[in-house]
Amino acid sequence: MSLKIRLKPNEKMLIGNAVISNGERTTEFYIENRVPILREKEIMKEDAASTPGRQVYFLVQLMYVDEENFETYHNRFWEIVRQIILAAPSTTPIITSICHEIMGRRFYQAMKEARHLIDYEQELVDAASADGETAKASESA
């Protein structure tokens, strides 16, 4: 079954190892085989992997687009996941979902789950910041 892709004007995407850049008009085409596909907005650059959750996303992305080096990325992934679970055990259900998708070699789905981890990580940071502000206000009162 074909995958229909519609690119907006000037949009870029990764198909396999090729970067595709669209021209001035919307373009539509079909992918006939199984190959890694990422839209520009889904691609995280290494310098953006600035938190543990973002590092997980980045490593899953690398597993997806560079399966030849899967083992290297997978080992690093587990190092980070262990640290995350030790620091924030409440992340375990999300990480379990990510791992389930990776085990099934559904890397795109694992990336979607990793987005949930990034969002949850931000919620934890925001909650910790709010708690810190509340504690400071209580001390100065």
Spans of features found by a protein language model:
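Terminal leader/tail segments of proteins
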Residues: 1-141
